[in-house]
Amino acid sequence: TDMTQTVTVAEGRAHVFIAVDHCNSECIGIHADRSANRFQALEPIRQGVAKHFGAVADDIATGLKLRHDHGSNYMSNNFQKEIAFLGIEASPSFVREPEGNGVAERFIRTLKENLLWVRDFETIEELRLALIDFARWYNDNWLVARHRYKTPAQIRENQMTPCDQAA
């Protein structure tokens, strides 16, 4: 998970938070807000947990590890308590080593080059809607070299067992 910034025409600075599955490069959550606090940073995590586990509940995501940097949002007690509540183990990257969170950093670069730097947004709400569309497009269309040029959606489909697909 990580954060970047952009600017909207009418509302000024907006913070964009993302969560990316390190295994298949799928964007599992994306969010924008004027505020850059720990509660906003949790939103993409909650989105991903709700999408892939069906709810946001105590220990529902046990076994997952969450890679994040040492930013104040991610190291805050509120953030750490929330992910622990979900059953997620924190996995902070090394200080001043952005490559330790390389999958998230690469997604942010792709997001900037294909959306944030090439399009203007009037409001944060317009930005949010564009981010949701971008995440959907990315998961279904972006070819990931380390997965032999398959999309994140194709990789996830191949990871699913027949029982998972039936559920």
Description of each model-found segment:
Residues 8, 12, 30-57:
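Active-site beta-loop-alpha junctions of metal-dependent nucleic acid enzymes
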Residues 1-28, 36:
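An active-site-proximal beta-strand-loop segment
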Residues 4, 23, 31, 71, ...:
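Anionic group-transfer/hydrolysis microenvironments
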Residues 62-70, 84-103, 119-123:
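RNase H-like polynucleotidyl transferase catalytic core
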Residues 77, 84-88, 110-167:
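C-terminal domain-tail junction helix/linker
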Residues 26, 43-49, 81, 85-86:
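Retroviral integrase
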Residues 16, 37, 41, 67, ...:
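Hydrophobic (often cysteine-bearing) scaffold residues that line and stabilize catalytic clefts
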Residues 6, 23, 52-53, 62:
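Secondary-structure boundary/capping micro-motif
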